[in-house]
A protein has these predicted regions:
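Structural motif corresponding to alpha-helix initiation and N-cap regions
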Residues: 27, 42-45, 184
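ATP-dependent carboxylate-amine ligase
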Residues: 1-40, 51-55, 72-76, 211-214
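Phosphate-binding loop of NTP-binding sites
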Residues: 6-10, 47-50, 59-215
Length: 216
């Protein structure tokens, strides 16, 4: 829901569906999305029309899902969520938070710090921020007025290598969704794609990717 809220907040017309809507679940999330102006459909293909410009799906959505099938029948482009986030990140001055753990917390902290500093950042996160939830929002996205964007960069599906942030922050590296060697390669690409790279040297694996030991 984070990217949907972000794009709606920038003035785009956004709609979407979820199988949980069919089952009568996720009612609170659905209400909050609709309060933002996002139209929510049942997962029955009714939200896909010839007027739809683009369909975005997460990596968990199969090609057999009716919305994907209908979009392809109508010749509507279909892209993955991670690819769209990479496009959004490329359009802003982006700070990408990476690491095996602590991403959501650090993303939230940095967003709040920048907000209090008057920098008016935007955010796309994997978890809700208390400061935004208190305002009645889902809390995982916000559109600020500046060029700054803070994102949580996920390594579990390898999508982190698509980002080319102004600032990349690496919190830690531990064996989790992938083997350690594969993670090291993924985060090395993340480092190489970042204009400025900040590493937490208290983690034995992440510090191996440090280029300048003095400044990290």
């Amino acid at each position: 829901s984070a990217i949907a809220q972000y794009l709606q907040g920038t003035g785009m017309s956004v709609s979407g569906s979820d199988r949980f809507f069919n089952e009568g679940k996720a009612g609170d999330i659905k209400e909050k999305l609709e309060a933002e102006g996002i139209t929510c459909y049942l997962q029955d293909g009714s939200g896909i029309t010839p007027q739809t410009d683009l369909v975005v799906a997460s990596t968990a959505i199969e090609d057999t899902v009716i919305e994907i099938k209908k979009a392809k029948e109508l010749g509507i482009p279909v892209i993955k969520r991670s690819a769209l986030l990479a496009l959004i990140a490329a359009s802003k001055k982006t700070i990408a938070i990476g690491g095996t753990s602590g991403k959501s917390t650090t993303t939230a902290m940095l967003f709040d710090i920048m907000t209090y500093a008057g920098l008016s950042p935007s955010i796309i996160s994997g978890a809700g921020l208390v400061s935004l939830i208190k305002k009645g929002k889902i809390g995982n996205a916000f559109v600020g007025s500046s060029e700054w964007l803070v994102i949580e960069a996920d390594e579990s599906d390898g999508s982190i290598v698509q980002y080319h942030p102004a600032i990349g922050i690496l919190l830690n590296i531990e064996k989790d969704h992938k083997e350690l060697d594969e993670l090291m390669n993924i985060f090395e690409t993340f480092r190489n794609n970042s204009s400025l790279f900040i590493v937490n040297q208290s983690n034995e694996h992440s510090k191996k990717l440090s280029v300048n030991l003095i400044n990290d």
